Amino acid sequence: MLCYVTVNAQETAPQRPAPPQARQQPTEKTRRFLLRYISAYDTCKTLKDRETILRGVEMVAQASANDWISQYHAGFYNAIISKEHKDTAEANALLNRAESFVKKAASLQKDESEIVLLMAMINGMRIGVNPELGAKLGPEVMAEYDKAKKLNAENPRVYLVIGESLMYMPEQAGGGKKAAKSMIELALKKYETDKHDDPAWPSWGKNRATELMTTLNK
């Protein structure tokens, strides 16, 4: 089934960036579209459909150039879609695009745990695409994990991402099933109080944490 975004007859999605002087915080309309794209993404069954949603999120980000949350989501979806591309050049192009949006978000919202964590994820994905980057980017990823946790120790996504990474690390390096399970348990606990005034605030990961806990309990 093709995923889609429902709109009112009088509404149209943002088609192009507004003039620089008009690009302020999100309008009610752009925020509404962002929420619809986020909701629709999880119903998509194909990569083509997910990339269609990505283009919509990017249009919202371009129309709300001073809104860090819109920039964040554009970076996030570029990053996670990169994992679906086996071609190295295509994956790297998406990660480069993701990083540009995340850097924009960081320039708008200093020292935000969600943004720092997303940059760590992007760097981790770069290592996945190009393992030879591990020596260079590996320490950066660990430092970004630590910074994200220090900025907001209640952010469940920090513990989820760290926990999942520990699943693939040897025990002698601090990883393994036991260490990963401890982090995922903490993530699930933090998700219980993960509430924000802005409905577009990053909220992903709870289902993934639940899936990982099921796997770790086997």
Task: Please name every model-derived segment.
Residues 40-45, 80-89, 120, 125-134, ...:
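Short coil/turn linking the two alpha-helices of tandem helical-hairpin repeats
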Residues 42-56, 90-100, 134-142, 181-186:
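Helix-turn-helix repeat elements of alpha-solenoid scaffolds
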Residues 9-73:
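N-terminal leader/linker segments that initiate helical-solenoid repeat arrays
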Residues 60, 105, 147-148, 187:
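Canonical positions in the second alpha-helix
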Residues 74, 81, 119, 126, ...:
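Structural register within alpha-helical repeat arrays
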Residues 13-17, 178-182, 186-218:
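Terminal, low-structured helical/coil segments at or just beyond the last alpha-helical repeat
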